[in-house]
Amino acid sequence: MQYTELVPGTLIRRYKRFLADVALASGDVVVAHCPNTGSMRAVDVPGCRVWLSPSRNPARKLAWTWELIELPMPDAPPALVSVHTGRANALVAQALQEARIPELAGYDTHKREVRVADARLDFRLSTAHAAAYVEVKQVTLREHDGHGYFPDSVSERGRRHLEALAARVAEGDRAVLLFCVAHTGIDAVAPAAHLDPAYAETLRRVAAQGVEVLAYGMSATWTHDGVPGDIALTRALPVSLERRLASATPLSD
């Protein structure tokens, strides 16, 4: 997925979930839309460099959207993190189209936002004789042990999606939970039992019932001017359903 224009700034604060104050290089402070309803635990770090996309729509209330943040990493360059949850499905759609996820290759059609019973799942992949349902979850929380965890707060909606996937398996379809790891510093994923034990337990149960769990990590390319130019899912990552964090203290609060 390619960005057409990004402007750097420094995060001052995020507030009211959907708003962020950002200082631009000019010294101006702007209010940007924060397209992330989650807790953004260990990601909402004041003082870090962020990247904003501008809107050319004069009718829009906020002219800026917060897209990315660079987070410090121990003994490594900063990690790039996509905070825009709406980009996760776009990254997965591109990866499916380009056959970058071998486990989900070979399907003729990719339909998005599919209603099943009382839930909506992100993708239905199909051939003439088989179907696979895929639910995408964006992972941005990197805890102090170096692993990525989902969810970053209690998620009843996430549990409902797991039950919907299990119901598809019971009907004879294939069902997949796909973690879209939008943090270049994460190399493995686990359910966040320290934040939402019910979600972790539900995930282990539905996995035992046949729901597949995959994780793919984001990579980024940069322009000659030092601006993020493209992000894509390129890295298959291991998932440990039994892992438990010894301490719930993240790299940053």
UniProtKB/Swiss-Prot annotation:
GO terms for molecular function: DNA binding. It holds the Pfam family SfsA_N. CDD domains: SfsA-like_bacterial. It comes from the Bacteria. InterPro entries: SfsA (IPR005224), SfsA_C (IPR040452), SfsA_N (IPR041465). Belongs to the SfsA family. This is Sugar fermentation stimulation protein homolog. It comes from Chromohalobacter salexigens (strain ATCC BAA-138 / DSM 3043 / CIP 106854 / NCIMB 13768 / 1H11). The gene is sfsA.
